Amino acid sequence: MNNSDLIIIGSGPGGYRAAHFAATNGLSVVIIEAKEAGGTCLNRGCIPTKTLCRNAEVVETVRKAAAFGAEASLGAIDFAKVMERKDQVVSQLRSGIELLMQTPGITFVKGTASFKDAHTVAVGDELYTAKNIIIATGSEAKMPPIEGINVPGVVTSTELLALTKLPRRLCIIGAGVIGMEFASIFSSLGSEVKVIEFLKECLPTLDSDIAKRLRQAISKRGVDFSMQSGVKSIREENAEDGSRQLVVTFEKKGKASEVSADIVLVATGRRAVVEGLNLEAAGIECGRTGIVVDDNFQTNVEGVYAIGDVNGRCMLAHAATFQGLHVVRRILGKEDNIRFDIMPSAIFTTPEAASVGKSEDNLKDAGTEYVCRKGFYRSNGKALAMDATDGMIKLFVTPEDGRILGCHAYGAHSSDIIQEVAALMNKDATVSELADIIHTHPTLSEVLHDISL
């Protein structure tokens, strides 16, 4: 029997950060990982995707080089090198986390964890006990019940990130964050991309006006969108040249259509990873979207917590990180002032989009009075200098005192601009206080400052 102060199941951005923070504050920690250190985010999610986003940005820059006086020819995309660079970035960061897990006080265990009781976890034949346990097992792709969903070539983001050949034609089912990022990446790399989405607009958590403008910007680069369309089936057949292809049948307003592709990416959502944990043995309640937790991320079992995607509250890597830090502080008997109601997020398309707080849709649905202030990149000096004038910021404030309710944007470096708003919202700042902050000239952040005046 191995006893420690804290057991953490999962070494993603929630688990490994919590482990390091706990150990540096004097707790003995056992962290259990079934796959690779760093979890889905590092190995099969955020980091490899953002690496490919950067590759795609470079390709787009070369395509526009003549406008900057540089006569450059793009030539063929060396997809093997693209993927090699992605693997190198992931490997380097994984090595860093593995080193971090050697911090005194941390015991890193490879294997699959399974509850024996509320405070005992088995990994193979070894038993580990602790007063406090954090479940941080993340999420996995959710496959919808579509005919032909198991046909070879129908993949999730995990398999797409492991491709060895650039697909000539890529069909993406779902226009959420994952679908939109891959649409942007693969269209830049040269694939013919088709996106099929059931909803009226892409990116449902983003302000619908911003989402529409972003979709239109990506459409101009050749991505074909079919919105309000439901996929009916996927089948495999031989093309006219004898090659194998996938045919996706979808329906829009009662009219059936088909699109052919070499690869079909299913990006219709994710679900909590709880299989094999044997939660029943610990009496832990699990709901439709994940493990049920309170506002301190504690389950119905005292001393057992669930953070990140596995609790289904907010499927963002940084949400997992800060939930983990909050839990460790609670275990240590310390307070914090983390505002989980202020959660910035970003979509790394080209151009990128980002948000924090309420959207105009949220405010209208809730019947909240607000003032919307809009700013456009096209009138900003830095945006013109960068040839990045396609962008917009929407800032929502209360009419009576100008308190900031939210900000949604798309355009170059919008994720950085949104972080400024997140900092202000954490302090309940008003738009007049934003107006008093000196902004460097020339910067894209001046778009935000201009609409505060």
Task: Label each region the model flagged.
Residues 1-12, 166-176:
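Beta1/beta-strand and adjacent pyrophosphate-binding region of the FAD-binding site
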Residues 2-4, 20-27, 32-166, 199-203, ...:
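Glycine-rich flavin
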Residues 7-14, 18-35, 40, 47, ...:
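Flexible, glycine-rich terminal cap/loop adjacent to redox cofactors
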Residues 7-9, 113, 128-138, 173, ...:
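Short hydrophobic core segments
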Residues 46, 137-192, 196, 224-225, ...:
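Glycine-rich dinucleotide-binding loop and its adjacent helix/turn
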Residues 48, 121, 272, 299, ...:
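Hydrophobic "anchor" residues
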Residues 107-110, 114-122, 190-295, 365:
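A Rossmann-like FAD-binding core segment of flavoenzymes
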Residues 150-167, 258-331:
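FAD-site-proximal beta/loop scaffold in flavoenzymes
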